[in-house]
A protein has these predicted regions:
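Extended, charged alpha-helical coiled-coil/arm scaffolds that mediate oligomerization and mechanical coupling
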Residues: 1-65, 69
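Walker B catalytic acidic pair
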Residues: 136-137
């Protein structure tokens, strides 16, 4: 009976202290939330500072890849706290003067997206260790010196990643370590695709074709491209 009485006294004491315990928990919760918000604010500030440098670096590379007026911008908007902070982050692009910023996920053409990706990967080359990168239409609608710039950017990127590029430009193809020729053939009403790895002589022949002919002068030009 005495033991039961003591037990009831302890239970009653616990109930009497419940309000105090709840107040302490509320105080601790508020303190933790304030610390979390302060940390999230620091993270937001760091992201904004890094984004300014990052956006300029990506835009500068885009200007050499046939998009001289393009502006790349990292959009940072406030959202509810999450494990990733209090920011909603989206990469956007204004391809030409007078055009608004477009989400890379929604309104950018394939060629533009490939060049943006090439620019991003070039900026992040030393940090990003994705083993394989594939570029399609990266040279869409361009030629001349811009083609050389794209070829050089892809070649530099190949020092950090394996890069697979589908191209129609000799400036790009000539900078590859390995070159494959893709052709289609119709046999009895069906279309077949052939892929052939080219040796040195095969590359000269294919580059000559891409240059527009197979004269001795063009073949010599193709040979020189492989020596650059």
């Amino acid at each position: 009976m005495i033991a039961l009485t003591e037990q009831r006294k302890e239970e009653l004491s616990s109930l009497e202290n419940l309000d105090a315990d709840l107040e302490e928990l509320a105080r601790q919760s508020k303190k933790a939330l304030e610390a979390l918000q302060a940390t999230a604010l620091k993270l937001t500030t760091s992201r904004q500072e890094a984004a300014a440098r990052y956006d300029k670096a990506v835009s500068d590379i885009l200007h050499t890849l046939g998009m001289p007026k393009a502006i790349f911008e990292t959009s940072i908007e406030t959202q509810m706290l999450s494990p990733n902070g209090a920011d909603k982050i989206e990469f956007t692009l204004a391809p030409n003067p007078g055009e608004g910023f477009k989400s890379l996920q929604k309104a950018v053409s394939g060629g533009e997206l490939s060049r943006v990706l090439l620019s991003i990967k070039s900026v992040m080359a030393d940090l990003d260790r994705v083993p394989l990168l594939i570029f399609d239409e990266v040279d869409s609608g361009i030629s001349g010196e811009v083609g050389n710039s794209i070829g050089e950017a892809l070649k530099n990127l190949g020092q950090h990643h394996q890069v697979l590029t589908i191209t129609h430009l000799h400036q790009v193809a000539s900078r590859a370590k390995n070159q494959l020729a893709v052709s289609k053939e119709e046999i009895e009403g069906r279309t077949y695709t052939h892929v052939v790895e080219l040796d040195h002589d095969g590359r000269i022949k294919e580059l000559s074709r891409m240059l527009g002919g197979e004269s001795d002068t063009i073949r010599e030009h193709a040979r020189q491209l492989l020596e650059v």
